Regions:
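Membrane-interfacial entry segments at the cytosolic side of transmembrane helices
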Residues: 1, 194-197, 235-245, 269-270
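Start-transfer (signal-anchor) and selected internal transmembrane alpha helices
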Residues: 1-35, 125, 136-137, 144-145
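Hydrophobic core of alpha-helical transmembrane segments in multi-pass integral membrane proteins
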Residues: 8-15, 248-254, 276
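Extracytoplasmic catalytic/substrate-binding loops of multi-pass membrane glycan-assembly enzymes
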Residues: 21-34, 40-54, 63-76, 88-100
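Sec/Tat-exported extracytoplasmic proteins
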Residues: 58-63, 107, 126, 133
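Membrane-embedded helix bundles of polyisoprenyl
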Residues: 72, 119-134, 143-190, 195-231, ...
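Loop-to-helix entry region of an early transmembrane alpha helix in multi-pass inner-membrane enzymes
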Residues: 80-99, 107-129, 162-170
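Alpha-helical transmembrane segments at the extracellular/periplasmic loop-to-helix junctions
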Residues: 268-276
Length: 276
């Protein structure tokens, strides 16, 4: 009965997070002279146009590198000149956010602004439920419900995930907690098959997180957390090594390379700064 009530409350918390953003959306619709332009909702963040423009280029089947060329002129042209390459960027080098906006725009008459804003309540629901699930895995069911409610409605998160805030912040926190929860679950669960299955799922969501956020550096603290949990839970060495390999594999080779590359760059810059 306890776990069922916690799961029901988790769903309710997610729906409350959805409702708060949806209520805000209804207020926007009542004030279209301020919040809409040409029957399309506006943005309330400076980062929004960057992602909307990428979605626009994808929607029009244009090269996203053309958008980057304009945004980073003339540095981008110089970089292309050095590489002597005009190849289109890999789809994985484009945030999953504009890709998602472009996909869902087909349900809203190709209105990218409308599609982007409609994703916000859904993202709030996912984030609230992810935070709650993390605490449930820790063993704090009802406390997790309170944490999910408090986090989704707290001022700092609410402002950054409100209507008009088309940014990767919409899912960054939710994906972060979801991955940590899956990593922890892969340690706590009994049976090697379940352990390996959960760590593979964690790696896959880390792959999505990296694709969404375009900053692969979070892989390192995730692996560090996994190793610490394995150590303190006295897990067998063989299964521990397999878990680490599977997590890295499902996170994506480019994510792994990018994470350690970022770490090397950070260390070099720190040493350079410290030597001055």
């Amino acid at each position: 009965i306890g776990i069922i009530s916690v799961l029901i409350l988790t769903l309710i918390i997610g729906l409350l997070a959805f409702k708060t953003r949806n209520d805000q959306w209804n207020v926007w619709k009542l004030n279209k002279d301020i919040t809409f332009y040409n029957n399309s909702p506006l943005l309330s963040t400076a980062d929004g146009p960057y992602f909307l423009n990428q979605a626009k280029y994808l929607n029009q089947n244009k090269s996203v590198s053309l958008h980057l060329e304009k945004r980073f002129f003339p540095e981008y042209d110089k970089e292309i000149g050095k590489n002597n390459s005009n190849d289109e960027d890999s789809i994985f080098n484009i945030s999953l956010l504009p890709i998602t906006i472009n996909y869902f725009s087909s349900f809203f008459n190709n209105d990218l602004l409308l599609a982007a804003n409609k994703l916000i309540p859904i993202s709030a629901l996912i984030t609230a439920m992810s935070i709650t699930v993390f605490f449930i895995i820790l063993g704090f069911g009802y406390e997790g419900v309170v944490a999910g409610l408090g986090a989704s409605l707290s001022q700092s998160i609410y402002v950054r995930t409100s209507v008009g805030r088309v940014d990767t912040d919409l899912l960054n926190i939710g994906l972060f907690y979801l991955i940590l929860g899956l990593v922890l679950a892969s340690i706590k669960v009994e049976g090697n098959k379940k352990k390996l299955t959960l760590i593979c799922i964690a790696g896959f969501f880390n792959f999505l997180f990296t694709w969404w956020y375009q900053h692969p550096g979070f892989l390192i603290p995730f692996v560090f957390t996994l190793v610490l949990l394995q150590f303190f839970n006295r897990q067998k060495l063989k299964i521990s090594i397999i878990q680490i390999i599977l997590f890295l594999l499902f996170s994506g080779p480019f994510s792994v390379i990018g994470s350690f590359s970022n770490l090397v760059i950070f260390v070099n810059e720190f040493l350079l700064f410290a030597s001055r």
